[in-house]
Each structure stands twice: as structure tokens, then as C-alpha cells.
A protein has these predicted regions:
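Short hydrophobic/Thr-rich beta-strand motif most characteristic of the beta2 strand and flanking loop
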Residues: 45-53, 60, 125
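Active-site residues of response regulator receiver
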Residues: 72
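Alpha4 helix (beta4-alpha4-beta5 surface) of REC/receiver domains from two-component response regulators
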Residues: 82-85, 102-123
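Acidic catalytic/metal-coordinating carboxylates
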Residues: 52-53, 79-85
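Conserved sequence signature across two-component system core domains
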Residues: 24-28, 51, 69
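Non-catalytic signal-transmission and effector/linker regions of two-component phosphorelay proteins
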Residues: 1-25, 31, 38, 130-151
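Short acidic/polar segment at the start of the alpha1 helix of CheY-like receiver
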Residues: 30-34, 106
Length: 151
């Protein structure tokens, strides 16, 4: 599990070896939630990259070319909508899974916005996230390709 420390150094692109592990990039200001998600992803063979700020998320996204993005909608100095727009501008091909403690209607609106922006959306998940909910949200081609039930 990769946890950038603040302040973060310049990010070097992570070159994936042919046949290398899939990458999951997540942003969450609650480190315990981020570690929980990262651990679940790593158990299914993903390389998990944790970010805690919008700035580090952007730089890690550009450097890592993730297969899955887990996006907390409520961040201290940013919000998930801003990051959804960033992902759309970057023509993100990753599966995007929004999570938050917000009301379910807000989460569903984020999924609709992401879809309208051309993103591949999954979920959403309301905090506190349960393992089975996380696994169910991640079902799809990524799950089958990774050879792990749920991821």
C-alpha cells in the first residue's frame, strides 16, 4: 500500500510491467477508511495508492494510470465534483466509485454527473462502507479480469 506523506515530492510516472498488477487509486481524508479500501483491493491483487488531497490525487492519477478510482466526495479543501470534472477532462478510462457520508441522493447525483461527463461509474457507497458493499460495487469486468470475487 502506498501512502504519500505530506508534503509530497514530485511524482514520477509508475510504469506498469506487462502483466503487472492492476492499480486502484483512492482519495479519502479519513485514513482508516482509505486503509480499509486499500487492504481489500490488495487482497484481490491490486496495487493500491492512497491520496489525501486533491493535489496529490491529480498528480498520482497522471503518474499511475489507474484501473479503478475510489473517490470520497467530501474533502477538506476540495470536493468530489471538482475531481469528477478533472477525470473527465483527462479522458479517464478507469472505473470510478464515489463514496461519502453524504445522503444517498447526493451520491446518486454524483454518479449521474460522472456518467453525463462520460466516466465509467460504479456504486455509489455511503459511509460507513462495509466490505461486502465494497465488493458488490466493484463487480464487473475488473473483478472478472483480476480473478477475485468482487474485485
Amino acid at each position: 500500500m502506498t501512502e504519500p506523506l505530506l508534503p509530497e515530492p514530485a511524482v514520477k510516472p509508475l510504469l506498469r510491467q506487462p502483466g503487472g498488477r492492476r492499480r486502484l487509486l483512492l482519495i479519502d481524508d479519513e485514513l482508516s477508511v482509505a486503509r480499509f479500501i486499500a487492504h481489500a483491493a490488495e487482497e484481490c491483487g491490486y496495487e493500491a495508492i492512497i491520496t489525501v488531497s486533491a493535489e496529490s490525487f491529480r498528480s498520482q492519477y497522471l503518474a499511475s494510470d489507474p484501473d479503478v478510482v475510489v473517490l470520497d466526495l467530501a474533502l477538506p479543501r476540495s470536493d468530489g465534483v471538482e475531481l469528477l470534472r478533472f477525470l473527465a477532462e483527462e479522458k479517464c478510462r478507469a472505473l470510478v466509485l464515489p463514496i461519502s457520508g453524504f445522503d444517498q441522493r447526493v451520491l446518486e447525483a454524483a454518479v449521474r454527473l460522472g456518467t453525463a461527463l462520460g466516466l465509467r461509474m460504479a456504486g455509489p457507497l455511503q459511509k460507513p462502507v462495509r466490505l461486502q458493499q465494497l465488493i458488490d460495487a466493484m463487480q464487473g469486468r475488473e473483478a472478472q479480469d483480476a480473478g477475485c470475487i468482487g474485485f
